Amino acid sequence: MESILCVDIPVQMISCTDTNGKITPMRFRFRDRNSEIITININKILSTDQDHSSLGANFVCSAEMYGTQKTFQLRYNYHAHEWRMSRIGG
């Protein structure tokens, strides 16, 4: 059974934006419960929703954290220009 942790954590993101405005997240970092900075290198983007008529772009990505493959749900807010992590799945 997969465990899912719902969170709302601001993240620092390194992403690439092409000339058409398509965003590709590459690496992000955040503070864990112990206030340690955790850096995550994104291995694969599983799904994306970048509808420019909405408030932001949603990404589901897979990456390794603490030696285990995890799924992360990330959101970029077009108006606030900020990235947030909303879910971590195991």
In which residue ranges do the predicted regions lie?
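Cysteine-centric segments in proteins
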Residues: 1-90
